């Protein structure tokens, strides 16, 4: 018996929706990264995109534990001398709900063409509405609510 290697044309990408209300950022991000890669499937093949589409709603209501809402800092640089900007988690959530979750998931995916294709299958929305109802996404429950 030989090992099965998935072929891109044979892979079925399902759609899932996750409600991030009162869930912990890292726990949601790690589960989403696992499902975007397709490692939860028996046909997982490292060089083929076997993952599913993930829609995350209520990303504005995701939590972090402890004092990370003030201590966790996201940096970006404009390219000019002295052009570094630092924003903490609370301010980033207020200005761009869901971007912290996108950055966390992106950091857990492989870097390169396959990883870039995987991150495109992640759809994050700050509110409870999403435009993907035509795909009939299944509800995916994730453990790890903030205490």
Swiss-Prot record:
Record's protein name: Large ribosomal subunit protein uL13
Oligomeric and partner information: Part of the 50S ribosomal subunit.
Chain's gene name: rplM
A GO term for molecular function: structural constituent of ribosome
Keywords: Ribonucleoprotein, Ribosomal protein
Cellular-component GO terms for this entry: cytosolic large ribosomal subunit
Pfam families xrefs: Ribosomal_L13
Family: Belongs to the universal ribosomal protein uL13 family.
Gene Ontology annotations of biological process type: negative regulation of translation; translation
Residue ranges of the region described as Disordered: 127-147
PANTHER family in UniProt: LARGE RIBOSOMAL SUBUNIT PROTEIN UL13M, RIBOSOMAL PROTEIN L13
Record has Lipid metabolism as a keyword: no
Signal peptide, first to last residue: none
Described function: This protein is one of the early assembly proteins of the 50S ribosomal subunit, although it is not seen to bind rRNA by itself. It is important during the early stages of 50S assembly.
């Amino acid at each position: 018996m030989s090992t099965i290697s998935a072929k891109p044309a044979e892979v079925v990408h399902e759609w899932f929706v996750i409600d991030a209300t009162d869930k912990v950022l890292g726990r949601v991000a790690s589960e989403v990264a696992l499902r975007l890669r397709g490692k939860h499937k028996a046909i997982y093949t490292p060089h083929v995109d076997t993952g599913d589409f993930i829609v995350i709603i209520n990303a504005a209501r995701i939590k972090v534990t402890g004092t990370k809402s003030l201590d966790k800092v996201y940096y970006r640089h404009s390219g000019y001398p002295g052009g570094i900007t630092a924003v903490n988690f609370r301010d980033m959530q207020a200005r761009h709900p869901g971007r912290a979750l996108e950055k966390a998931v992106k950091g857990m995916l492989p870097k390169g063409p396959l990883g870039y294709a995987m991150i495109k299958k992640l759809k994050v929305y700050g509110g409870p509405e999403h435009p993907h109802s035509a795909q009939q996404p299944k509800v995916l429950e994730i453990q790890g609510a903030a205490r």
